[in-house]
């Protein structure tokens, strides 16, 4: 809940149930902005509160009826590439456009997407024949321009990501049974990832 202070230094933690735990030192593996918030932030160096968090991401978890059938490596049967991190990022010019579009419009309609299919290595994650995939998407901003919010953009962004994956694996869209969308704002509110920065 918060970092306790004593004698000008961190002295322990106050937990959400009201329990206080004293400690000789407190180690925080968290975003500096979150640490200053938990500690009250009054006497911290300015660098902590001004820490730049501009690498927001968009995440989506999908349930799939079948494995993606990638045009470059055809086949719906599990193959080594299905058990690897699959990065959909064409040449540098593509990445440059994705970055520029996100800076101007808040998110890229053609982002860089990493596809992970953990059910290919752990068959307990999905029913027999089905799979789950995690889509890690880059070139999305936390703060959208023009007064737009992620509540109003998240479905369109998710559709754009699915469109992109479908260009590389034509059966992808039709194989999606369900999806869970995590915009940069969702990543912050649900997991405490400041500005959606993973």
Region locations from a protein language model:
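Charged, low-complexity, helix-prone segments enriched in Lys/Glu/Asp/Gln
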Residues: 48, 97-102, 153-157, 187, ...
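A glycine-rich dinucleotide-binding beta-alpha-beta segment and adjacent secondary-structure elements
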Residues: 108-116, 169-198
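Contiguous hydrophobic segments
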Residues: 92-96, 134, 159, 193-197
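Mid-domain catalytic core of redox enzymes
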Residues: 2-126
């Amino acid at each position: 809940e918060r970092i306790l202070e004593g004698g000008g230094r961190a002295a322990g933690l106050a937990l959400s149930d009201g329990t206080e735990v004293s400690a000789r030192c407190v180690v925080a593996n968290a975003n500096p902005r979150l640490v200053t918030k938990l500690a009250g932030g009054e006497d911290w160096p300015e660098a902590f509160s001004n820490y730049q968090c501009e690498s927001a991401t968009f995440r989506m978890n999908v349930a799939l009826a079948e494995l993606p059938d990638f045009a470059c490596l055809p086949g719906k049967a599990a193959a080594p590439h299905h058990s690897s991190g699959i990065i959909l990022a064409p040449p540098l010019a593509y990445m440059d456009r994705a970055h520029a579009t996100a800076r101007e419009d808040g998110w890229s309609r053609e982002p860089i997407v990493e596809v992970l299919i953990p059910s290919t290595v752990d068959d307990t994650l999905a029913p027999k024949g089905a799979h789950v995939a995690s889509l890690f998407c880059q070139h999305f901003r936390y703060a959208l321009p023009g007064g737009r919010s992620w509540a109003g953009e998240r479905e369109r962004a998710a559709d754009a990501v699915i469109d992109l994956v479908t260009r590389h694996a034509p059966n992808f869209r039709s194989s999606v049974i369900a999806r869970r969308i995590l915009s940069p704002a969702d990543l912050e509110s649900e997991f405490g990832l400041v500005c959606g920065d993973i």
